[in-house]
Each structure stands twice: as structure tokens, then as C-alpha cells.
Amino acid sequence: MSTAVLTIDLSALAANWRSLNALSDVETAAVVKANAYGLGVGTAASALAEAGARHFFVAVAEEGVALRQALGAGPQISVFSGHMAGDTALIRDAGLTPMINSIDQMIRHVEALPEHDFGIQLDTGMNRLGMEDGEWRAVREVATQRPPSLVMSHLACADEPSHQMNRQQLDCFVEMTQDITAPRSLAATGGILMGPDYHFDLTRPGIGLYGGLPFVDALPVVQLDVPVIQVRDVHPGETVGYANTWTATAPARIATISAGYADGLIRAMGAKARLHAGDTALPVVGRVSMDLIGVDVTALGSDPDSLQLIGRHQSVDTVAGFADTIGYEILTSLGDRYKRVYTQ
């Protein structure tokens, strides 16, 4: 088989949800946008529901429809992008809860689905999604008559607990939501770890569920093993890959593995990246190609059948570091060509 195998440990995923749930005294939801961070939303969300999650968040309404088909009736599914033009039928038919981000969305929702649940997203300083203070004041009286199912905001710097922006956003959120009776939510994974001041009525862990930072106590959820297509001897002075970026200075044994930037192993990893055969770390040589990567396996006593990129020796965040990026980008980029194997 020439397809890399992405093994997803559902028991670890569920354990991470339970661990994050134990860190607060409030309801713990689960963020499963981007196909559950690339791991397969139907299977992942079902495991999280079995662990106890009853509220899920997705990025767009289409993701919510797919999730509803996987989970069936019952769990609440909230949509971060709110009520976009053209989403009305999806929201209604799949029983989704749009997180209203603007006055225009508020008007659209009330006119199209006057009896349908909605939430509110407020901007407390990130300047991304949500109503600013003036907008919120303009619609607050109307919006809270229902009341909304949830009022939320999102922290910009929760991965840096000491950053002054966290307290600034907390204070802003408290001020903007004074005297409302609706449940409130501010914390994703990083906010959960900053303590009860940030927890309010519901937390929304995402990356921590899948084994990523800043949740350092997370169990690893993914393992990526890539098959070796071919192994060859390379002599001193010979080069490997596009643009001759790596030249052998001694006799070398080079394996070509079946994955590349089309599979989410981004080109920026380059020669910083390492793979493993057992406990032996092996360097990438030459450029990462669309479908192929060269690895120096000279240190091994025999040619390997496969090499491991993500697993017990290096996490998603370690691999992200090879490319000076974040674990989120690597995880959500892991491509459709991988064979996904789920274990319990």
C-alpha cells in the first residue's frame, strides 16, 4: 500500500474532553470545525458525544448539516459564522444555532426564522467576528427578549496566559454582558487553562481535544506512518530532489516516502524535519515535493517499510515547529489521501 496511514485514537480524544471538562465546573462543549480539525467529524464527534459532549461548534452552516447527519437530533450545534445569506434553509432544516455576528445578521435571522434559536457573538478586541459595543447596544434589547441560547466572545492571546489582552477582553466581556440572563462563553482551550474567571457558563475546547498545545497534559490523538516507495544509494557529490538543495558529502542511503505538501506536509518543513524508524530519528533531505519526500536512512541497518512523522517521538506541534508554524495548521492540513484508521 502506497497510502500513508493516519491513526486516530478515539479513546485519547474522549479522555482529553473529559480532562478539559474536569478543569471547570461549567458545561464543556466541543469544537469540531474543519472536519474535526482534519480527523473526520462524524467519527470524532460521535466519540465526543459518547464521552459526554452535548454542545458542538462548527465554522459554517454546511459543516453543521454534516454534523447533524452524523449525530442525529439532540446535541446543540452552533455555527460561528452566524446566519449568512443563503443559510436559512440549512439552519432551519438541520436545527442549527447561528451565532449572530452583526446587525445585518440579526435582522436576517429575525425576519427569516423569528421563532428559531440563535446565539450572539461579541467582539471584545480581537476585531474578527462579533458585534462591537455600539452594535450590541443597538440590538441588545431586542436580542435579549428571547433570550439568546448563548452569548460568547473569543480570546486573541489565550496561548499566552500572562498577556494583558486576556484581562482586557475579560473585563470588556463582563461589561458588555452585565445583567443578561443568557448563558455566556469566553474560553476555548487556552481560556480553560487560565482558570474560573474565564469559564462563565460554557467552555469551548478545540485544539486541546486533539492533542495540541497549549494543553500540555493532552494525550496524543494522532499517529502518521508514511510508506517508503523506494530506497537508493547516493554517492558523494550527488544531489537529491528539486533544485539540488541537498548534496551528499558521504555515501548515503536515501528513502523516498509517499507523502508531500499535497498531503499537508508543507514545503516549509524542508531539511529541519525528522521522521522516525523505531527510536532512530532520520533527517529529511532535499525539498518537500507534492507527493514525495526524501529521507536519509543511512543510520539504519536495513531498509524500512515505513517511517513515522507524528507519534510517540514527536507531536503535531513538534512537526509544526519544523515549518515555524502551529499545530493547528498541520493538523487541519492532513490530506484526504491518508487512510484514516480509528482505534478505541
Swiss-Prot record:
Record SMART domains: Ala_racemase_C
Binding of substrate, residues: 128, 290
Catalytic activity: L-alanine = D-alanine
Gene Ontology molecular function terms on file: alanine racemase activity; pyridoxal phosphate binding
PROSITE patterns attached to this UniProt entry: ALANINE_RACEMASE
NCBIfam families listed in its UniProt record: alr
The protein's name in its UniProt record: Alanine racemase
Species name: Roseobacter denitrificans (strain ATCC 33942 / OCh 114) (Erythrobacter sp. (strain OCh 114))
Source lineage: Bacteria, Pseudomonadati, Pseudomonadota, Alphaproteobacteria, Rhodobacterales
